[in-house]
């Protein structure tokens, strides 16, 4: 709640509600897992069959039979794929499981993340300053071209995956692994206790389907809805796309009395360095210095 002195914050923990009065707020809640819309109800109704990669390690997968599908082409997808690939074989690389492993992505390929010394200059305060002062159209265009600066797979992981696939191919092992790029998931439904996934190839527009016993969606993260801020939403300025307007020093532009700072919610305004942990420390220092009124860091 916005108040004349700043904000009133209500926090519920273990069934108990606490009330805090403050002059300023820092929102650092991060992002939440994103699951394609056609899979959301299936994930809710059949969590043992469909889950986001964020939950991959919390509950061991069972029923690894038939088709097992990994969606996505980032680092998380690659690591899930490697783990499932290894579970098909024993220590002597003999096939011990009969499930078929499918790795699909709508991206044009399974590409490495840009991690060269000069490429990393995009994750610097200087580049953040440059990006901030572009207009909205320029920012949107730049972000579309920079996906592999913060998405993609590490070169080592790609090499490890290729080595595993190569070693099994030259050994004449039965093919149990399939990789498909440019495959856009357009529909999913549960049929006969399996998840039918319908894809459309981005180039040929040909449709095909897979009936999966298990689906792991390594499909990234998205900005949460921030329902807890609904009392102050009307006071916050937004751009034409509905994004929060954020100053260069990470303050929301709003009409309330105090300041609201944000962490990891400014991709649209500050660029690809937003989720970077190194820049996160720099961003936190700038916020702390403003709260203190002097340069501690």
What spans do the regions from the language model cover?
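Flavin (primarily FAD) cofactor-binding/catalytic cores of flavoenzymes
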Residues: 1-75, 79-297
């Amino acid at each position: 709640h916005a108040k004349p002195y700043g904000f009133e914050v209500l926090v519920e923990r273990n069934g108990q509600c606490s009330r805090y009065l403050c002059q300023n707020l820092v929102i650092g809640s991060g992002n939440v897992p994103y699951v394609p819309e056609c899979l959301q109800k299936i994930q809710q109704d059949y969590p043992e069959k469909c889950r986001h990669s964020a939950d991959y390690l919390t509950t061991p997968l069972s029923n690894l039979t038939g088709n097992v599908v990994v969606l996505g082409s980032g680092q998380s997808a690659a690591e899930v794929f490697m783990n499932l690939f290894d579970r098909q074989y024993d220590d002597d690389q003999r096939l011990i499981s009969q499930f078929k492993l499918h790795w699909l992505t709508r991206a044009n390929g399974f590409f490495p993340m840009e991690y060269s010394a000069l490429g990393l200059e995009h994750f610097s305060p200087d580049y953040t300053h440059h990006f901030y002062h572009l207009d909205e159209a320029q920012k949107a265009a730049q972000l579309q071209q920079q996906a592999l600066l913060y998405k993609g797979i590490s070169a080592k992981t790609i090499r490890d995956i290729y080595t595993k696939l190569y070693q099994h191919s030259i050994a004449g092992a039965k093919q149990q692994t399939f990789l498909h790029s440019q495959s856009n998931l357009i529909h999913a439904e549960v049929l006969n206790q399996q998840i039918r996934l319908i894809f459309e190839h981005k180039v040929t527009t040909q449709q095909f389907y897979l009936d999966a016993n298990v689906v792991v969606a390594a499909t990234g993260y998205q900005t949460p809805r921030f329902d807890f801020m609904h009392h102050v939403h009307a006071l916050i300025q937004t751009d034409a796309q509905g994004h929060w307007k954020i100053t260069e020093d990470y303050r929301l532009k709003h009409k309330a009395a105090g300041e609201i700072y944000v962490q990891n919610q400014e991709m649209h305004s500050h660029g690809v360095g937003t989720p970077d942990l190194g820049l996160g420390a720099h961003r936190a220092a700038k916020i702390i210095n403003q709260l203190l009124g002097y340069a501690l860091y």
